[in-house]
């Protein structure tokens, strides 16, 4: 256990996919700045993230984003006590930009450095809110790259209970959006169309996999949506606005049913009374409402961060890095990035 400096100032850096972000957080709780530079316009015409374009965009964005985070917090690099950056999982080229930049700052300014697992950031983002859960809790981290359920015993002790076996929830949203001719990223656009659709109109499959397990699979659902869409197009030449809305609503509900059911089952199985939601998919309003309703019905406490802390951001990385540093000390500058999560 490393001694904690009062009012420790952490610089967080995130570049795991297509968002370049830098944040300044004090003591793992107080956000002083949280700057995010997205790449939606770059990738929209491709219907998804192009890794090479993403890494190039990070290269041009990282310096000004960090400078703005420091400026917004009204501090300089000389005031930073710890640098925390995403080490994985994610796109290797994207990860390397933020990770290498953070290590360079650490070497030049002689500031302690720690690499952070992106999923830990999503699970601990709730600690940035005024109302926070007690440990242990069950955390669902649902994003574009992965969907996982963790038993979070402390801020540095995670047990992996279940993960996606193929497409993650966010990835399924993006792929279905592309099929329906909706822009990238798909989640917000599907959610918007779903508001005017009937979630009971189409019986899309729910992949429960093992009855008592907590793994996810959304590739079958994605294929079912593709086949349903193609049948309508083959018959009528195109789909109507109403048909698109019904597809969005029915698809979204199928994802929600699986995420909610498996997460609550994990809490029941392990005797945990608190559920925490994190990751980009958790900004979905229908998912939040479903979790709130089911947790209330099951007498479970439910926590979810503000939407701005659910999508990829450096503030959550700063929080996870702060706690990791206090327990394990500074990271090894010779370590490399990793594409698959090593959490739990």
Curated annotation (Swiss-Prot):
Keywords: Acyltransferase, Cytoplasm, Iron, Metal-binding, Transferase, tRNA processing. GO terms for molecular function: iron ion binding; N(6)-L-threonylcarbamoyladenine synthase activity. Fe cation binds at residues 118, 122, 312. It catalyses: L-threonylcarbamoyladenylate + adenosine(37) in tRNA = N(6)-L-threonylcarbamoyladenosine(37) in tRNA + AMP + H(+). Its cofactor is Fe(2+). One of its GO terms (biological process) is tRNA threonylcarbamoyladenosine modification. Substrate binds at residues 141-145, 174, 187, 284. Gene3D superfamilies: 3.30.420.40. CDD domains: ASKHA_NBD_TsaD_bac (cd24133). Binds 1 Fe(2+) ion per subunit. It comes from the Bacteria. Belongs to the KAE1 / TsaD family. Required for the formation of a threonylcarbamoyl group on adenosine at position 37 (t(6)A37) in tRNAs that read codons beginning with adenine. Is involved in the transfer of the threonylcarbamoyl moiety of threonylcarbamoyl-AMP (TC-AMP) to the N6 group of A37, together with TsaE and TsaB. TsaD likely plays a direct catalytic role in this reaction. PANTHER family: TRNA N6-ADENOSINE THREONYLCARBAMOYLTRANSFERASE, TRNA N6-ADENOSINE THREONYLCARBAMOYLTRANSFERASE, MITOCHONDRIAL. This is tRNA N6-adenosine threonylcarbamoyltransferase. It comes from Desulfotalea psychrophila (strain LSv54 / DSM 12343).
